[in-house]
Amino acid sequence: MSTSVLPVAWRNPDAPHVLDNAAWAALTGPHARFAERVGHAARYPLDVSPFTALADPSDPRAWDDLAALVGPGTVTPVSGATVPPAGWETVRSGQGVQLVATALHSEPAPEAVRLGPGDVPEMLELIAETEPGPFLPRTVELGTYLGIRHRGRLIAMAGERLRPPGWTEISAVCTHPDHRGRGLATRLVRAVAAGIRERGDIPFLHTAAGNTTAIRLYESIGFTLSRRTESVRVRTPDRRQEQTAGPCRCDA
């Protein structure tokens, strides 16, 4: 068993940190091989992850690059942004929390099995049943995913998603409703964290701000609330409609 211990003041709240823009840091770092990028905007392939990120959400040039990347009239999520520029439509907004492993005991789970592409149909079925967050046909390529089976059926899983330099996000933590209350999710989180720490990274994770049950669980096993996060789902300006409409004529 190993323990991830960070000092109480593990970051300076007045200075930028790689986790402040984790998706961008991952797409321009360890996950650069997945990145579809135009200038200051990047995203994962649509069958890998829904994450879209901007180098600086306050920079209008980054939004122009995003429009070029995803195309006109396209709905896309944007991490770390709250209000899009004029001409963009906000479809939905959401708040989350980010937690960092400051005192997490990590250890392998002997009953856990490594999940791969051949397990994706079962993984997608479990995700649909439990709704822990986005998981797509190629999400399994982002890192290590572990699962626990009961009589051959996948009943719990957890794995790795974002990988900003020095950090790895634990994601897709879920247990089938018929098997909850047995500590399966906790064992898988510890096991995934053990692999993360073996390569020298620090585990972190995200959850919805309103998911107080999950937040309390993660805090109880050694995660500390790091920051609140914002995201928006936006529709890019449809320049095609503007071009079709043409200039307005106002004859007196």
Question: Positions of the model-derived regions?
Answer:
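N-terminal charged segments
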Residues: M1-P84
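Short amphipathic alpha-helix that is part of the acyltransferase structural core
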Residues: S2-L19, T102-G133, E242-A252
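A short, internal acetyl-CoA/4′-phosphopantetheine-binding micro-motif in the GNAT/acyltransferase core
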Residues: T52-S58, V173-R180, A208
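Conserved acetyl-CoA-binding loop-helix of GNAT-fold acetyltransferases
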Residues: R61-L66, G181-E198, I215-S220
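Conserved active-site alpha-helix within GNAT-family acetyltransferase domains
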Residues: V83-W88, T186, A209-R227
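Conserved catalytic-core motifs of GNAT/GCN5-like acyltransferases
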Residues: E89-A101, H206, T224-D238
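A conserved beta-strand-loop-helix scaffold within acyl/acetyltransferase catalytic domains
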Residues: P134-T144, I148-H176
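Conserved hydrophobic beta-strand within the GNAT/NAT acetyltransferase core sheet
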Residues: I170, P203-T207
